[in-house]
Amino acid sequence: MKALLIVYHSLTGGTRQMAEAAAKAAAAEPGAEVRLRQAITAGPDDVLAADGYVFAAPENLAAVSGLMKDFFDRCYYPVLGRINGRPYGLMICAGSDGTNAARQAMRIVTGWRLRAVAEPLIVCTHAQTPEAILAPKVIATNDLEKCRTLGATLAAGLAMGAF
């Protein structure tokens, strides 16, 4: 059984919904075990025990959220050189753009020598005021379907040995 680790951080619920959608779809794929972890609790042992990854983060001030960055910081050197070539997918929950956060996360996982199996999935909530940015989010059904597709694709690819 191949293990898919989904690591996320969410302050307003948007990224959590995305990660849960990916996890639910991935869990439906035979031959794959899904481990959904919040960034604050995930660590190097989780990363080493997985065969593939989905990283899901909100974009805060044009960067990945602090707690997601903390996860990468805590895990980077303990797993460096030990997970080369493993597949990953990336999901960003953004207010308007998301490209800088995606670029930042991609640079980090490039250092780990991970292999992207899809373009980063950026979901824009269009939250532009302080009130809207801090408010609980509800991710649109069509965007959640994209998250499900990413999770299912990674799980199926791992189970079949395609990645």
Where are these regions (language model features)?
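A structural signal for isolated positions on well-ordered beta-strands in alpha/beta enzyme cores
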Residues: 4-5, 33-35, 89
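Generic structural signal for well-ordered alpha-helical scaffold segments
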Residues: 23, 72, 76-77, 155, ...
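Helix-loop-strand module that forms the ligand-binding subsite of alpha/beta enzymes
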Residues: 40-124
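Short helix-loop-beta junction
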Residues: 19-32, 110-115
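N-terminal beta1-alpha1 ligand-phosphate binding loop
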Residues: 2-27
